[in-house]
Amino acid sequence: MRHVWVIGAATLLFATTAPAFEGTIKLRTTALTADQLAEGNGGKKLDDAAILAMTPEQLAKNDKAQVRESMVYVSGSKVRMDMPMESKGSGYAVVDLDKGLTWFVVPGEKRYIEWSETDAKAIGEKMAQMKKMMTERMASMPPDQRKQVEAMMKNMQMPDDEAAPQPTVAITPLNKTQTINGMSATGYKATEDENTVVAWVTNDQPELNKALLNVSERMEKLTPANMRKENVRRQLQQKGLPVMVQNLGGGRYRVEEIIAVEQKPVEATLFVVPQDYAKTTGRDALKNIPGPGGPPASAPAAAAPAKKP
């Protein structure tokens, strides 16, 4: 599910920085495990080359294939992405780049979460406080428990930590082109986190391609410098719009596609969160996390109601 949001968020965000583009983007993700692929092949295990040669249409013929579709709506600086939620029905995200705000909306529960740079900063500060508190308490811990906490803290990155060296991700041209969902695309191959990635990149959408790097820079501002990670998708964005990304690893094969891009007027109401929905923010989640001074207050001061997006 996370990967659907990743490709969707990347597409919807970079689209908004191009004022000339207004319309919709349709996404689809198709996934199967290696065992399910073998079952569909008469019990015979397929090698990586055979799996990567399978198209989404071929995968979808397997009755165990997980197929999910979602829509992205773009209008000026506002973007909305609809998508299914495994346990709560459908949900959507609204991004307003002019305001620097994102709203994650859950209609089934009539609530939404607001996220901003202020929330990201507050969470980073809280993480630093927690790390300091754990460091102070380690001195009184039994040796075994102290080792466990030390190991956990070693993997925790804080806003004031130095950035860890980033491994170089090599992207190799396949020297192949094909038409995918009506768009001419060039193939590339890479390895990331022990996964094989084959991506097909198009330049048929110039407005979207031009906006890609601008949005990447905006998104980086929401992440502390030491926590930013160079990845295959970021490098692919330098080459154009990834119209299809095949990912094989961990016993799973997943294909993410942009199956349609349509330029047309979009209703303004799609970007409005209902007034009667309950609001929470990223900072609200911090109220129940104890700080260095002890447990959180039992009755925090009420905040003034914020304006709806």
Q: What would you call each of these model-derived segments?
A:
Residues 11-12:
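Repetitive helical segments and hydrophobic/amphipathic motifs
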